[in-house]
């Protein structure tokens, strides 16, 4: 199951420049991170769900590309976002 409307709105409010900012890289990365974290719980129960795992890998790849773009364009917001999301880098 995907994220609820309320959860997405909270993420957009926390990471966006305003309440309707859904397109910025920071918001997109935060939404992808929430979806990835949600799917990790799914895979602890359903180890053989390879179809969903392919979707997870696609999300991880998209997040990596967005983070690389953000690192090229604005290093300060990249570092801030990584710390706020608790990602490794």
Swiss-Prot record:
It comes from the Bacteria. GO terms for molecular function: rRNA binding; structural constituent of ribosome. The keyword rRNA-binding applies. GO terms for cellular component: cytosolic small ribosomal subunit. Part of the 30S ribosomal subunit. Forms a bridge to the 50S subunit in the 70S ribosome, contacting the 23S rRNA. Belongs to the universal ribosomal protein uS15 family. One of the primary rRNA binding proteins, it binds directly to 16S rRNA where it helps nucleate assembly of the platform of the 30S subunit by binding and bridging several RNA helices of the 16S rRNA. Forms an intersubunit bridge (bridge B4) with the 23S rRNA of the 50S subunit in the ribosome. This is Small ribosomal subunit protein uS15. It comes from Yersinia enterocolitica. The lineage of its organism: Bacteria, Pseudomonadati, Pseudomonadota, Gammaproteobacteria, Enterobacterales.
């Amino acid at each position: 199951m995907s994220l609820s409307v309320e959860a997405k709105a909270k993420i957009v409010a926390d990471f966006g420049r305003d309440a309707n900012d859904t397109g910025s890289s920071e918001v997109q990365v935060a939404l992808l991170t929430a979806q990835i974290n949600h799917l990790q719980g799914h895979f602890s129960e359903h180890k053989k769900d390879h179809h969903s795992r392919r979707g997870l890998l696609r999300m991880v790849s998209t997040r990596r590309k967005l983070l690389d773009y953000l690192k090229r364009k604005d290093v300060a917001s990249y570092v801030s976002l990584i710390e706020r999301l608790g990602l490794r880098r």
